[in-house]
């Protein structure tokens, strides 16, 4: 928000989560002026708010292929500039390494289980490319990050509405 203010631009940041505890934690530990909304994004009633950019971190593994296709189709009509996903990449190596380091690290049982589930349910690049194609998205960029993560950037301005 500081960067936007330094450029004399108005910005409204909205955090959406279905988990009340996550939202309470975020509100207590926030450094930015963010409006938080409790909604179930996976619900068929959920409406993506019109905005300039949609940024999602470590979430799309909750969607089935078809749900993600529908979400992307809907998002293209609501987002002005870009959709950005920061996600895990599913692989045998990442799963095995998480199991190993999870054993060594003092993670709670829940964190270990959630981490393994997230890796098992995350997408491969090929799967995401097929999903993007089905959603009518032809322009996108993958940026690979350490520890089996990637950033997927989908510019919206180049898509036909």
Q: Which residues fall in each region the model found?
A:
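Conserved acidic residues
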Residues: 34, 52, 81
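A conserved beta-strand element that flanks and buttresses the S-adenosyl-L-methionine
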Residues: 55-56
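Hydrophobic adenine-recognition pocket in adenosine-nucleotide-binding enzymes
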Residues: 59
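Class I S-adenosylmethionine-dependent transferase superfamily signal
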Residues: 75
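Conserved beta-strand signature within the Rossmann-like core of class I S-adenosyl-L-methionine
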Residues: 79-90
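C-terminal alpha-helical "lid/dimerization" subdomain adjacent to the S-adenosyl-L-methionine
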Residues: 88-134
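Conserved Class I S-adenosyl-L-methionine
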Residues: 121, 125-156
């Amino acid at each position: 928000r500081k960067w936007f203010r330094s450029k004399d631009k108005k910005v409204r940041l909205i955090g959406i989560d279905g988990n009340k505890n996550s939202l309470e934690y975020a509100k207590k530990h926030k450094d930015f002026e963010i409006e938080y909304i409790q909604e179930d994004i996976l619900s068929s009633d959920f409406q993506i708010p019109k905005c300039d950019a949609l940024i999602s971190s470590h979430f799309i593994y909750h969607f089935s292929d078809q749900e993600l296709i529908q979400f992307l189709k809907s998002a293209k009509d609501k987002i002005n500039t870009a959709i950005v996903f920061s996600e895990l990449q599913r692989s045998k190596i990442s799963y095995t390494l998480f199991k190993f380091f999870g054993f060594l690290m003092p993670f709670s049982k829940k964190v270990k289980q959630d981490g393994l589930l997230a890796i098992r349910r995350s997408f491969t690049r090929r799967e995401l490319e097929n999903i993007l194609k089905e959603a009518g998205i032809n322009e996108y960029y993958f940026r690979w990050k350490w520890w089996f993560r990637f950033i997927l950037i989908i510019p919206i301005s180049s898509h036909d509405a």
